[in-house]
Amino acid sequence: MTDEPRNASIRMDALQAHHAEAAARWATRLGLPRVGETDFALQLGDQGLQLVELGDKAPGPVRVDFVEGAAAHRRQFGGGSGQMIAKAVGVQSGIRPRILDATAGLGRDAFVLASLGCEMTLIERQPLIAALLEDGLQRAELDLEVAPIAARMRLLTGNAIDLMQNWQGEAPQVIYLDPMFPHRDKSALVKKEMRLFRPFVGDDLDAPALLAAALALASHRVVVKRPRKAPAIEGTKPGYVLEGKSSRYDVYPKKKLEGA
């Protein structure tokens, strides 16, 4: 699903001795060495699982945290159902669609929609990112306030196109896509997460196939998040567009969403 990412080396570390056993299980599951000189490390500590680049000028670690920080702020002050993403997927009075986020990443958008009451299924194809997301969801389930939101988020790991083409059970009403765009803007290079993930993920170059699979599966609509000035994904044209300052949502309607 990507161009060929550069060959980055990574090991598994336990930051405290009492996490050694759990770190060993992650290492076995992900096929990571426990020792050796590497470019990156997946670390397990008291704050959970985190990915960090090693070296003098490396940025800090990245972890998934749905309880505190940016996720908590957006949950409390983010604008609720008036947010553009909510409008794009069809959230309105009496309507909370079942949504598949086929490009979950660190789960931020899925968490926003789950916090608004949507039942979410998430797909993440990169095992390291999926591990961070799984760990973040497990910690969220331990928080009294956030646990009901996390309970609405189900994580699948694998190739989104394959999973959508072989979908079992009731189809999602809405499929949400946020393909990693080949960034040319130099400012994007300084973003910590982009810098960390690019060696493992690369750019999504088969977005047209992803969109086609989504359109075939979704019962009501497909929504694609894009940089504001980026072209639409090749293939079917969006029915309408919601545009913000830096990004936009291309909406492909199939059927009107109705309340229960």
From Swiss-Prot:
Pfam families named in the record: SAM_MT
An example Gene Ontology CC term for this record: cytoplasm
GO molecular function, one term: rRNA (guanine-N2-)-methyltransferase activity
Subcellular location: Cytoplasm
EC number: 2.1.1.242
Keyword terms, alphabetized: Cytoplasm, Methyltransferase, rRNA processing, S-adenosyl-L-methionine, Transferase
Reaction it catalyzes: guanosine(1516) in 16S rRNA + S-adenosyl-L-methionine = N(2)-methylguanosine(1516) in 16S rRNA + S-adenosyl-L-homocysteine + H(+)
Gene3D superfamilies assigned to the protein according to its UniProt record, in alphabetical order: Vaccinia Virus protein VP39
Broad EC category: transferase
Residue positions binding S-adenosyl-L-methionine: R108, D109, E124, R125, D178
Family: Belongs to the methyltransferase superfamily. RsmJ family.
Known role: Specifically methylates the guanosine in position 1516 of 16S rRNA.
Database matches in HAMAP family: 16SrRNA_methyltr_J (MF_01523)
Protein name according to UniProt: Ribosomal RNA small subunit methyltransferase J
